[in-house]
């Protein structure tokens, strides 16, 4: 992965979980990592580790991507960017009846509008240099919705639709667009999404290792890879859903209602 050595890679949601792992892998390969998240204390810790273990170049830019007015300010502070990894996001698993409009707005602000705003912020420079890569972390939930994930699935459907259209718009510009569609990953995501722990327990055997997911994402940088779909068996399920939606909804609905 020496192809990313010296490249400036902006990672949102970098204070833990998948974003943190991606930052370490990129730094280990000599990339100049630019980290954003709300938790400045965690960003400081991650920067210290990168500096000590890999003598890596790392800068931190605290940011809540749900606050769209702050994105342009941080973008100006960062300077040039070769790769944007839109990783920031969260979910709340509730029924449609029990979910709130505040939850809906918060999820769309971060998962969708924040992602779009960060992308728009880097595009002019990438177009000028005729090279770049935008990697959007979506989800298998963006391909197949399940009970209690209506709002979260809606945000990830939006990310996939946006990314697919953007990829076509940027054809021939030298800018790649990749979406990452993982199933459940063993991270802090479920401390918010699934406070009772029932869903994590129910899908435990399908849980992905964040280090493995991060490795696949990092390896895809500056390739024309359209999508990364994980795990393979769950991705096969989404393809089956496209062919037999009623059957899959009946079977999956029963199993996944335990969120």
From Swiss-Prot:
Cellular component GO terms held in the UniProt record: membrane
GO terms assigned for molecular function: oxidoreductase activity
One Pfam family linked to the record: adh_short
Active site (catalytic residues): 152
Organism domain of life: Bacteria
Keywords: Oxidoreductase
Residues that, per the record, bind substrate: 139
SUPFAM superfamilies, A to Z: NAD(P)-binding Rossmann-fold domains (SSF51735)
Residues that, per the record, bind NADP(+): 11-35
CDD domains in the record: 11beta-HSD1_like_SDR_c
Enzyme class: oxidoreductase
Enzyme Commission identifier(s): 1.-.-.-
Family of this protein: Belongs to the short-chain dehydrogenases/reductases (SDR) family.
Full protein name: Uncharacterized oxidoreductase YqjQ
The species this protein was found in: Bacillus subtilis (strain 168)
This protein's encoding gene: yqjQ
């Amino acid at each position: 992965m020496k192809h990313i050595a010296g490249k400036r890679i902006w990672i949102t949601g970098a204070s833990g979980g998948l974003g943190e792992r991606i930052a370490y892998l990129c730094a280990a390969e000599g990339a100049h990592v630019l980290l954003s998240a709300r938790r400045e204390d965690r960003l400081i810790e991650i920067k210290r580790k990168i500096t000590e273990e890999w003598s890596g170049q790392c800068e931190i830019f605290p940011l809540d991507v749900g606050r769209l007015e702050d994105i342009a300010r941080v973008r100006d502070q960062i300077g040039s960017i070769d790769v944007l990894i839109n990783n920031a996001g969260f979910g709340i698993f509730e029924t449609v009846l029990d979910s709130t409009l505040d939850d809906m707005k918060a999820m769309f602000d971060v998962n969708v509008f924040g992602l779009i705003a960060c992308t728009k912020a880097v595009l002019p420079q990438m177009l000028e240099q005729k090279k770049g890569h935008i990697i959007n972390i979506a989800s298998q939930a963006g391909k197949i919705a399940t009970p209690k994930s209506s709002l979260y699935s809606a945000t990830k459907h939006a990310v996939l639709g946006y990314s697919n259209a953007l990829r076509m718009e940027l054809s021939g510009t030298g800018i790649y667009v990749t979406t990452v569609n993982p199933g459940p990953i063993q991270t802090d995501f479920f401390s918010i999404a699934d406070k009772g722990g029932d869903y994590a327990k129910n899908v435990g055997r399908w849980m992905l290792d964040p280090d493995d997911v991060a490795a696949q994402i990092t390896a895809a940088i500056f390739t024309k890879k359209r999508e990364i779909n994980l795990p393979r068996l769950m991705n096969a399920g989404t393809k089956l859903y496209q062919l037999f939606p009623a059957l899959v909804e009946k079977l999956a609905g029963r199993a996944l209602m335990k969120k």
